[in-house]
Amino acid sequence: SYLLKQVVNVDDIREILFNVSNKIILPSFGNLSNNQISYKNNKDIVTEIDIKVEKELYSHFSKLIKNSKFVGEETYSKDPSILNYYQSDNYCWTVDPIDGTSNFAKSKERFAVMVSLTKNKQIIQSFIYKPIGEEFMFADKTGTFFKNKKIELSVNTTIENSIGSISTKYWDGNKKEKLVAIKNNFKNINSYGSIGCEYFDIVLGIRNFALLSRLYPWDHIPGVFIVRQAGGHDCHFDKLEYKFYENSKNLVVSSSKNLSYEILNLIGE
């Protein structure tokens, strides 16, 4: 079945991301002028570079698989109906051209390019590329790989030893208070300002979890799959795995099922 093989060659993707990074992203890092930065929906910034990178990736990926669909963060801001592509049986690329745009614009190193390939509501392959350091992690049906090694998450962390993020921005009042109240139960709560870089570090055992509210697919499909295929765990509050193809909310992603359930328990879910 098509799920058992790599649909696209990892080296092709790595090369595309490396080239786009060296051609478009890195030359602008630390060199952005204010007129290259704008706001969408009053709070999220977008740079000319995000838009250029997305266009470039679209042109490459549409050639790799004929008739494939494309969901990009910047394309979505012009046409939200593209999320319907997940309901079709076409291959669909999901792209976050620069995850951590704010960091990128402030010359902070934590940002990533994230890509996923899905079909029939299944995630098939995912890729995260960090331009600073040229770090590349990917996952397919056989597992998660970094630096030519298969990564197996074996950390069995408890809440009091856990480091992670709790995004309180989009919860309603009641839940928000609860989330603020539980922060002290963990070893450390902080955010990178790039969820892609957080997922990367959950796989490497540097972090342990992320508790999320608003779920845009380009922010989460790549990283959730990479964590899942490394032996980590993801679930909505109903304990079912992430449904990227629905307008779902509230997700916990962690290094183990036990930790996810402990966190859900703590917030009373």
Stretch-by-stretch model annotation:
Residues N84-F145:
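DPxDG-like acidic metal-binding loop motif
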Residues I25, D50, F61, T101, ...:
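Residue-level signal for inorganic ion chemistry
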Residues I37, I82-Y86, I128, F136, ...:
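Short secondary-structure boundary/capping segments
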